Amino acid sequence: VINVDKDHYISLTESYEKCASDAIKEIYDSFDGRALENATFDGKLMAIPSATPGIGAGLVWLRQDWLDALNLEGPKTLEDLEHVLEEFVTKDPGGNGEGKTIGLAASEKALFGNYGALNSMDSVFGHFKAYPKQWMKDEKGNVYYGSTAPEMKEALSVMADWYKKGLVEPQMATRDTDDMISTISGGQAGAFLGAWYGPDYPLPDSYKLEGGSKWKPYVVAQNDDGSVNAYNLNPTTNYVVVRKGFEHPELAIKILNQECWEFINDTE
């Protein structure tokens, strides 16, 4: 902001309008103007902002082979998920032995407020419109801290109830992330919370189990209309600027076009 105020950079408004490819404009448009607004001062685009895609609503990954073995349908609500976890723990479809099956794998790391993190229970909290560790705005535009909002009480009470019922990893307070993953890859756990990247992390080792394993993601904590409550972070964290006096500022946009084209058309 200081360097923009001091007139160190050249406006990229014209270069963007004339040179940006349709693909680039479509990407920025998908953020409803938020990314470009972060780099716009007095109506002028003064930088090329990064555009980090949102991870979206959190997912619960479930052992689909266990669901099938117990003739259970995939959960849609928290109540459905609670029932599934109860069935996993009490009926032991993985053959781990009495008292050895973990319903929901968990660790004391990144439990909430860590956007898109493995083990994050933000999707559960979001059902109650609770957003721990996040600065939010209420309907009147007032800023509040999510961790101290009244909605946190109900969300925490549900998680406490699950823990007391033995549906969540009993040793979660002493497990780190790697230790938690070992319960997934070792076949003890039937569920974990995460995001779209589950097949790459942490599931690969679980596929090597004797007899294999099948996992499927589900969107739970749905509202009555099928929607879910979630938050997204600011899409922009980095910027490319062009110094004042540079003869061809449009090159910055053309380089971006080329990089985008190569990424979209990469078949490897």
Regions found by a protein language model. Give the residues of each.
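Extracytoplasmic/secretory soluble proteins
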Residues: V1-E268
